[in-house]
């Protein structure tokens, strides 16, 4: 199966092949794109916590109206697929595909360097590091007429790009949205796709995570900036939601006390430490033990957007704060279990 990172260009590796023509260049968004997508997570840079918003799946009219078809010479590379890493058949792998936005036909070498760097960042974080052999990594060229993306550096900047990526989505400067119908059309050029990461040709901080998607062949989409140091962590964090079925561990966004059932997510719980131990539930095996995210594993109140009623395993981790580049042990196990689900075709 596949994790897709979207970005214009061809990465090195074996097995490069031209894909069929990509649909959607210059076309209006379809019915699926007109719907609002819920559960979009984004980060404004003001603090460690993320936020949730409902945003349109299609680019706004002011961006669509600027679109023009690519010239014949530009279309030759549009949609071309290359393998950055191929370790086995897609039916037995987590397939990761990179496609990007805001790279012109003459900027494919720039994309190649950006994509290689982003994948290296992802692969440097455990448990991805120890399990890269369970992943295929593909790239798909997406040629844009303009360089850069809309909303950078100012809200009124409009660019004609392959995926319609834009800052100031839903009026929020750092929320970097994409046209999911166009993302879908490029992602389908790869042999398989489970998660999509859109790499925007920009140095501006921003991003978004589309989780719990329906009607698409992939399980999630994240967007990030190509030239911002923290952008790779957005991709890792968002991929963890879809692959490991992990919850956010920060506690901003909801008022009051959580009073719902025990969550299915492996890294949050309604049980304080003693009750968790007595029940043999969730991360009871790690309680009191040192954790790679820092300190010892316990039950720390405040998680899943609630300040009270939900507990997380550690004081902080990559599911709570981007200043930490480590997943805690329960989250690592959730990701490893997720890798196994993909490699066994589940």
Could you tell me what each predicted segment is?
Residues 1-21:
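Secretory targeting and sorting signals
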Residues 239-255:
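Catalytic Zn2+-binding segment of zinc metalloproteases
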Residues 101-106, 143-147, 202-206, 229-231, ...:
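Solvent-exposed loop/turn segments at secondary-structure junctions
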Residues 26-186:
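Propeptide-to-catalytic entry region of secreted or membrane-anchored zinc metalloproteases
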Residues 110-111, 215-238:
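Short pre-active-site segment immediately N-terminal to the catalytic Zn-binding motif
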Residues 88-91, 129-132, 188-193, 292, ...:
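Extracellular/periplasmic catalytic domains that process cell-envelope and extracellular macromolecules
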Residues 148-149, 184-193, 199-221:
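Catalytic zinc-binding patch centered on the HExxH motif and its immediate surroundings
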């Amino acid at each position: 199966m596949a994790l897709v990172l979207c970005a214009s260009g061809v990465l090195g590796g074996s097995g490069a092949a031209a894909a069929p023509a990509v649909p959607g260049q210059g076309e209006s968004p379809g019915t699926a794109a007109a719907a609002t997508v819920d559960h979009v997570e984004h980060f404004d840079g003001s603090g460690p916590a993320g936020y949730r918003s409902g945003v349109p799946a299609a680019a706004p009219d002011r961006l669509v109206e600027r679109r023009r078809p690519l010239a014949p010479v530009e279309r030759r590379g549009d949609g071309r697929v290359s393998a950055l890493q191929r370790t086995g058949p897609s039916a037995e792998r987590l397939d990761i595909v990179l496609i990007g936005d805001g790279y012109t036909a003459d900027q494919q070498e720039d994309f190649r360097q950006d994509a290689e760097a982003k994948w290296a960042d992802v692969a440097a974080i455990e448990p991805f590091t120890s399990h890269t052999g369970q992943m295929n990594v593909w790239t798909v060229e997406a040629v844009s007429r303009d360089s850069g993306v809309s909303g950078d550096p100012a809200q009124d900047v409009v660019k004609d790009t392959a995926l319609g990526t834009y800052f100031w989505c839903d009026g929020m400067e750092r929320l970097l949205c994409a046209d999911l119908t166009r993302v879908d059309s490029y992602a389908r050029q790869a042999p398989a796709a489970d998660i999509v990461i859109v790499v925007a040709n920009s140095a501006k901080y921003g991003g978004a995570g589309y989780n719990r998607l329906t009607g698409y062949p992939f399980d999630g989409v994240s967007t990030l900036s190509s030239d911002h140091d923290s952008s790779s962590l957005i991709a890792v964090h968002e991929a963890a939601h879809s692959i490991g079925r992990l919850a956010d561990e920060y506690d901003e966004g909801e008022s009051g006390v959580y009073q719902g059932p025990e969550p299915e997510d492996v890294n949050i719980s309604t049980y304080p430490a003693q009750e968790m131990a007595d029940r043999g539930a969730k991360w009871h095996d790690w309680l009191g033990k040192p954790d790679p995210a820092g300190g010892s594993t316990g039950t720390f109140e405040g998680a899943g957007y609630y300040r009270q009623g939900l507990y997380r395993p550690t004081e902080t981790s990559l599911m709570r704060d981007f200043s930490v580049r480590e997943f805690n042990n329960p989250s690592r196990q959730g990701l490893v279990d997720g890798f196994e689900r993909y490699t066994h075709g589940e």
